[in-house]
Amino acid sequence: MYIVETLDNLIHQTAFFNLEFGNYVMIAVALFFLLLAIKFGFEPLLLVPIAFGMLLVNIYPDIMAPYGDGGAGGGLLYYFYKLDEWAILPSLIFMGVGAMTDFGPLIANPKSFLLGAAAQFGIFTAYFGAIAMGFNDKAAAAISIIGGADGPTSIFLAGKLGQTTLLGPIAVAAYSYMALVPIIQPPIMKLFTTEKERKIKMGQLRPVSKLEKILFPIVVTIVVSLILPTTAPLIGMLMLGNLFRESGVVRQLTETASNALMYIVVIILGTSVGATTSAEAFLNTDTLKIVALGLIAFMFGTMAGVLFGKLMCWATKGKVSPLIGSAGVSAVPMAARVSQKVGAEYDPTNFLLMHAMGPNVAGVIGTAVAAGTFMAVFGVF
């Protein structure tokens, strides 16, 4: 009898008896993301950990159990998630991005800042769209950053504004659209440009001196942080990583920030973001609204960048390719690669990558500034 009861207890403790239909739906979504990442190569560094975190939390929800529940110590991914909520991991991601980024194209062509700024139009489109859909001001602000296609900044702002219940859907939407940049952007770019404009070649960028590259992160940190102190965690870490790279005197720190530390943070960030997508938290109308708003915002941001690129093309009498305008969103370097790919489709000798990197890295700064602006407006520091 004791053996039968033991077996019965073991059977009823399996996940099969504790999961609901929604959990199986989310498991299917996680497997789909893994398929996209592994078989089709859609940003595997992002989607594999996110999808696996999604898989784990929907099979074993207690992996996200808060500290103190029933006297327990809390689930493993709960502690990972707190690093998101406290804005530690997004800031470290920015340091790694800075250590890997060459701001030379932006320094050589400062007009790229305008294209990066134009692409932020999608953020404010999403903000007013979210307000219209019934979200409160802070929730709308957190959702709107998806329009910049910037996962770390989306997580950072959602945590700072206290929108922790929306952090999962916001982060998954932001990272999903980052991964889908090669699919979403080209049709918009082609819709708003002529074949002649797509064939425009741009002149070689001027050489950028070592002194300029060293001064850039220092000056940007001082200027932006003085104007918007709330941007200091993101801009400061981004520029610190870049200063590691450009100074040339801390090679070990550059390698650590851009490789080992970056990948460790991506693993922890990805799995913890995925773990916020339990069926209960994710399968609701708010999630559908966030996904829709994110897509619309990203499309509007791409469109605004391309249209501003057309304006610059007209103003410079054909010296600027409108295709680099779409790179103003902060999905680095995916958006710049898309500009290169679309341009090469119409002229294989057209090399736009370095020109597109200017607005692309400007978009990273622009999205961080937009997040800092929202924080300042709502009095969050």
Q: Which residue stretches match the model-derived regions?
A:
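Interfacial helix-loop-helix linkers and transmembrane-helix boundary segments
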Residues: 38-47, 66, 77-80, 100-115, ...
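Membrane-embedded hairpin module used as a gating/binding unit in multi-pass transport
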Residues: 173-249
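Intrinsically disordered, low-complexity non-transmembrane regions of multi-pass membrane transporters
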Residues: 1-18, 24, 187-216, 249-255, ...
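Alpha-helical transmembrane segments
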Residues: 165-183, 293-301, 324-327
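Transmembrane helical segments that form the transport core of multi-pass membrane transport proteins
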Residues: 221-308
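Alpha-helical membrane segments and immediately flanking helix-loop junctions
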Residues: 86-87, 94-100, 115-125, 129, ...
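Entry/N-cap segments of selected transmembrane alpha helices
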Residues: 31, 105-127, 278-305, 356-360
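Hydrophobic transmembrane alpha-helices of multi-pass solute/ion transporters
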Residues: 4-18, 39-40, 54-88, 243-266, ...
